[in-house]
């Protein structure tokens, strides 16, 4: 089990990296957050986010994608001296926790100045066309003179960082630097193209520029590897060349190397794989090749979830430093809990990518569906209640359990009722479809927390308001969740018509030709689940997209499964009737008749009602949270449970 304590963990040992010493081997690797000001300066939200992670015990934090120019990208920027004080304030704050600050310097693959002029003129069509062109051709078309200008701007950025007290500069070896290194993307015939020496020339010039502008700063280098499947990333080096280049980086004065998956495809699942799409620690074989070739420290990233994952990487000589990215979003106190001998209490990341990766791709700020404080650090905090209360919670799904956890942390006496004999609510079926088993970590965390905190958990008991009154509560939180909705159409009560939730919970077992009515997330997951078991599956959806709510990093995997297993998709299609052998439907083109042995309903959920009359008559304050209030997702469930309980 991940919660088993490990004695004398190497993860907690200090390590010397060039001119600095890290207090432990756990780093927060570069991630785009969307927290910065419009000009890329450090905002209060950004400052609080990084400070909170430092407070949790990590030794090294890297700000991702820091641009030395005013790009259109929503990333941090350090292109003018006026931005230095904010970076200095952040560096000073991290240093209070003995945490080193790094910036990952990068340059995008487009003409920043030309695009800025187009945006200034309001010529959006030309700007979009220019951006699209440059993303495909800038690597080949950028002149040596322009590259020299970029080098100077990078050097000035490094100088500003050093003046701000930044400890480490990490070269982003992907993006423009990685594209120039790549045999896949670089087709140049000048001194920056062709041979290995030429393709890596600019990268080494960046390193030299850092040394020139900040001779005493620690230098990190993100070394992107083009793995066995080059479609997953093109902007970097294949492993044999990467190993040779790592040696050159060490010779050039780089102090550590951060090995990662190359990415130049626009799909963040390449570098930040979602649950079930890549093995844990999926980059370890490539990282070890690099580690074996150099004597400087090497860091590893890539679906590293548990303390045991990281410890094994160090023990097995794969790396010296471990990057926990999404894991620290889920639980910024990850390191403290290891140090305190409480790894069981770590809120482990599910790797769902909904709050983090999807948010960034949708131009929202970074968040975590399991951590309601993420993005609101030092604004949302759990503090002891002024008055101890008895709190009764109805429902032990994610909203109810989170409310119970928070209320207990605040010092209240908490009772939780649930009609089922196990906790977790809908998470128990959400973790069944392909790739979704990792959602069980959320159940494990919440169940363990309420146990540790002494919550009185009363399972297998359906309660009424009158029952609750016997407990003499001061506060009641209703978290009764939702139930699958069966569409009222002719034939819905026939014996071969089933419920997607019951299918996923192994209460019903359709087989043969199956029509799933509803192509939302549950319908699509159920269809995939049934197709992988050898059934002939069709999905009928009224809207124009199947699984629209699925993570953008997972949906391509689902669609690939649909194609592989022959799942037929009918969008913009309305079901009109179910017969003994068919599902009748209508499209804009006319009627469709789908033969079937079974029909499975997955058209959505409806909130479960709870009669609060008796409680209201006694003037007991009642809050309704999660799907019981409004059907949504786990993010909404956790957040509403947190906020309701924290207000007590």
What are these regions (language model features)?
Residues 386-417, 458-466, 480-493, 501-552, ...:
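Rossmann-like dinucleotide/flavin-binding elements
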Residues 416-453, 529-573:
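Rossmann-like dinucleotide-binding cores of NAD(P)H-dependent redox enzymes
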Residues 270-276, 320, 427-435, 542-547, ...:
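Short beta-alpha connecting loops at secondary-structure transitions
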Residues 219, 298, 457-459, 497, ...:
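Generic structural signal for residues in well-ordered beta-strands
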